[in-house]
């Protein structure tokens, strides 16, 4: 974890003191999801992306290796009936407290130039009953709120980057003092993500447009 990522560390401090709070009130000066000209920052000093699964985790415990073990799949996989997940592990520097995922934003992101925010860390999800282990890395959120990542299946890459989810009901904009850029939205399963996962399981387990998570992305603006 980069210690100069003040926004991410502040989020962790708030979490430790008060539990998971609703960060959505931070976005007060939003713009349409097409991102009006001049609102996307050129440079940032870090920040965080918070992913809150839209479903309830039925049981949650901590395994010896630090993984969170539960009977329901979590981000970015929605629960799959008949396919219990045994371990969901946040890959450092991402963390998974209280069933919510926090990813630090790479402070070297240049959203106005590259069109996205790079996230640090990843997630692994294991389905031992099916002999399936999935890892999701190299996450990024584009300036419209769509989510991308690379997927590894049982240690083998299933290809290049794919779009995991489409943005839905996105509210995007700068804070009134222009020091923060926020994306607040709901993520829904993309066609290519559903197709890729269904091939891995050999069955239709994901449906396009399924809700995955609510997202609060807060980036600290330099200029």
PLM feature segments, named:
Residues 1-10:
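Bacterial N-terminal signal peptides that target proteins for export
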Residues 135-191:
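An exposed acidic His-Trp-rich patch
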Residues 79-160:
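Predominantly extracellular/secreted and cell-surface proteins with exposed
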Residues 10-19:
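Bacterial N-terminal signal peptides
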Residues 25-112, 181, 186-223:
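N-terminal segment immediately downstream of the Sec signal-peptide cleavage site
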Residues 4, 23-25:
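Intrinsic low-complexity/disordered segments
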């Amino acid at each position: 974890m980069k210690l100069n990522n003040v926004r991410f560390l502040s989020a962790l401090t708030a979490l430790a003191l008060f539990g998971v709070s609703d960060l959505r009130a931070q976005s007060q000066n939003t713009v349409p999801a097409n991102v009006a000209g001049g609102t996307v920052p050129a440079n940032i000093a870090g920040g965080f992306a918070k992913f809150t699964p839209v479903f309830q985790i039925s049981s949650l415990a901590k395994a010896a290796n630090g993984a969170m073990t539960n009977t329901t799949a979590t981000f970015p996989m929605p629960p799959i009936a008949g396919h219990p997940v045994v371990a969901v592990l946040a890959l450092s520097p991402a963390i998974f407290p209280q069933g919510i995922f926090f990813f630090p934003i790479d402070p070297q992101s240049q959203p106005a130039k590259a069109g996205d925010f790079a996230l640090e860390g990843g997630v692994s999800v294991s389905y031992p009953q099916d002999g399936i282990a999935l890892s999701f890395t190299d996450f990024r959120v584009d300036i419209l709120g769509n989510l991308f990542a690379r997927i590894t299946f049982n240690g083998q890459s299933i290809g290049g980057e794919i779009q995991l989810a489409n943005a839905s009901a996105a509210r995007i904009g700068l804070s009134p003092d222009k020091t923060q850029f926020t994306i607040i939205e709901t993520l829904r399963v993309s066609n290519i993500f559903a197709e890729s996962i269904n091939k891995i399981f050999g069955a239709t387990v994901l449906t396009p447009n399924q809700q995955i998570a609510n997202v609060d992305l807060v980036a600290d603006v330099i200029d």
